[in-house]
Structure formats: C-alpha cells, structure tokens
From Swiss-Prot:
It is found in: Cytoplasm. This is NADPH-dependent 7-cyano-7-deazaguanine reductase. The gene is queF. It catalyses: 7-aminomethyl-7-carbaguanine + 2 NADP(+) = 7-cyano-7-deazaguanine + 2 NADPH + 3 H(+). Its EC number is 1.7.1.13. Substrate binds at I56, E57, L58, H75, E76. Pathway: tRNA modification; tRNA-queuosine biosynthesis. It comes from Nitrosomonas europaea (strain ATCC 19718 / CIP 103999 / KCTC 2705 / NBRC 14298). The keyword Cytoplasm applies. It holds the Pfam family QueF. It is an enzyme of class 1 (oxidoreductase).
Length: 139
C-alpha cells in the first residue's frame, strides 16, 4: 500500500454513464513552493466534474496532490497542470478546478481552470428553490 507522493492518477469505471451528475471535491491542504522564494504556498482546491466513462480514485488523487508539496510552481501553472493531468486520466465531460491560494504579500490569488469535452453540452438547468450550500464536514 503506497504512502508516498505519486504523480500516478488512478481511475475506476463510472457506475452511471447514462446520466450527467456532478462530483464535488474539496482539497483544503494543497501545498507547493513559491518558485521565486522557495517558501510554501497553501491553497484550498475545489474540484467539480461531470464524469464520462471514468471517475478519479480518491487515494491516488490524495497522493498526487501530495506530490506537489516540494515542487516550485506558479499558482496559474500548477492549477492548469493539475487540470490537464485529471483530464488526461479521466476524459470527463466537464471539469473545473478552482485554486484559492492563501494570502501572500497581502494578495489572495484565485485561479479557475476548466475543460469541456468536445461536443458535450450541459442539460438545461431545472430551477428549484435556492438552498444554501451544505457541506459534510463544515459550516
């Protein structure tokens, strides 16, 4: 059982390929290094995707995210690299990665990167009552 950082992303077959549904993940402890100063940068990543044939396996995602801990990377570059690797592994219908980096020099940086599978169109939204977002583990 691997407990070391790894760039290997694993997938499993989407159990419901006939329906568009959103998978939402929050990764509150992303860390990489500032390529200019070598100081750690911390971010909260939010991953939303609509799978096609494959879903990402959570432990491999955790080890993949962990692999950036000692790498120097600009916020924009690392967000897009992670998105590209997820797209290559899963080939989702749609995916959005939002990186919210904690304050550095008085500046917060948010980077949002998206990919949409060629030809895929979302279903029209069904407008119901608006509910506040509810999270499993926090407010």
């Amino acid at each position: 059982m691997t407990t070391q950082p790894s760039k290997q992303l694993e997938t499993f077959e989407n159990p419901v390929q006939t329906r568009d549904y959103r998978i939402h993940m929050e990764i509150p402890e992303f860390t990489c290094l500032c390529p200019k100063t070598g100081q750690p940068d911390f971010a909260r990543l939010t991953l939303d995707y609509i799978p096609d044939k494959k879903c990402i396996e959570l432990k491999s995602l955790k080890l993949y995210i962990w692999s950036y801990r000692d790498e120097g990377a600009f916020h924009e570059a690392v967000t897009n690299r992670i998105l590209d690797d997820l797209v290559a592994a899963m080939k989702p219908r749609f995916i959005r990665l939002t990186s919210k980096f904690y304050v550095r020099g008085g500046i917060f940086t948010n980077v949002v990167a998206e990919h949409r599978k060629k030809g895929w169109q979302p279903q029209p939204p069904v407008l119901l009552e608006v509910f506040e977002q509810q999270f499993n583990t926090h407010g």
